[in-house]
């Protein structure tokens, strides 16, 4: 495999360049804003491209060293996409409510994960010896724990890198990562505060197409890291029963700048 490729055109088609209404902006994002159109800020994709590439390389390099990447996105339009991307790249995710202390109080979280594993074993054995009512209660307990912790059940320890969709909503998760020295890669929209984000990526964090694009790229970057790691260990990927499949990308040559691809009625922002 190779580090996933992407084009400026793909970012535009996914709506990555659309920020929020101008009155909802965070002035700290001014340096990442190209201009405004119809009272909506337009993100400067000429800055997004290199920052996104840098983050993808970081993910691959983290995984090749055996590191763990935690995908975090609990908003409605990101939840399923986050879970799918993490699962298919053998990484970890939190896509329901972030529980305070999920990282900083890992010992307590580990106890809850142990409880979840125990419930899995009991129910896998059809909860023999339990009444119908007791089994129902066990199933409810497992469902509740799995919704909160299922995505990190096999993580084993705190992650080596965190990828976040919507820094405003996931502020507690970011604070916990910072306290533990875990680097944070995050999509930052025009209403976000980029301060404290180790690897900011300017882009829309609300549109499903944009979120799908980010998550697909990061999942493939993690898979690239796994492939590189296995290659270094002498594993023959072609001999595996389920060899990694590289998606076919549309070959779109883009020689124009973001300014050329955004309509001419865009008004430059004043810093």
Curated annotation (Swiss-Prot):
One of its GO terms (biological process) is translation. Keywords: Ribonucleoprotein, Ribosomal protein. InterPro entries: Ribosomal_uS2, Ribosomal_uS2_bac/mit/plastid, Ribosomal_uS2_CS, Ribosomal_uS2_flav_dom_sf. It comes from the Bacteria. One of its GO terms (cellular component) is cytosolic small ribosomal subunit. Transmembrane segments: none annotated. SUPFAM superfamilies: Ribosomal protein S2. GO terms for molecular function: structural constituent of ribosome. Belongs to the universal ribosomal protein uS2 family. This is Small ribosomal subunit protein uS2.
């Amino acid at each position: 495999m190779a580090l996933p490729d992407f084009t400026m055109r793909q970012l535009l088609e996914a709506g990555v360049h659309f920020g929020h209404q101008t009155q909802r902006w965070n002035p700290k994002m001014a340096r990442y804003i190209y201009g405004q159109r119809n009272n909506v800020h337009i993100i400067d994709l000429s800055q997004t491209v290199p920052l996104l590439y840098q983050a993808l390389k970081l993910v691959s390099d983290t995984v090749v060293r055996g590191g763990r990447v935690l995908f975090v996105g609990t908003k409605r339009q990101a939840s399923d996409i986050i879970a799918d991307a993490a699962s298919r790249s053998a990484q970890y995710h939190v896509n329901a409510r972030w529980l305070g202390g999920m990282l900083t109080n890992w010992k307590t979280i580990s106890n809850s994960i142990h409880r979840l594993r125990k419930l899995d074993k009991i129910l896998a054995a059809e909860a023999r010896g339990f009444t119908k009512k007791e089994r129902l209660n066990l199933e409810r307990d497992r469902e509740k724990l799995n919704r909160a912790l299922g995505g990190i059940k096999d993580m084993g320890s705190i992650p080596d890198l965190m990828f976040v969709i919507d820094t405003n909503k996931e502020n507690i998760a970011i604070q916990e990562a910072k306290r533990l020295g875990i680097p944070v890669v995050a999509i930052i929209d025009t209403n976000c505060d980029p301060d404290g984000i180790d690897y900011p990526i300017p882009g829309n964090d609300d549109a499903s197409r944009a979120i799908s694009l980010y998550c697909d790229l990061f999942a493939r970057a993690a898979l690239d890291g796994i492939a590189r790691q296995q290659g270094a260990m002498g594993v023959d990927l072609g001999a595996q029963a389920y060899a990694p499949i590289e998606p076919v990308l549309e070959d779109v040559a883009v020689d124009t700048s973001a300014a050329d691809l955004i309509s001419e009625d865009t008004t430059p922002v004043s810093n």
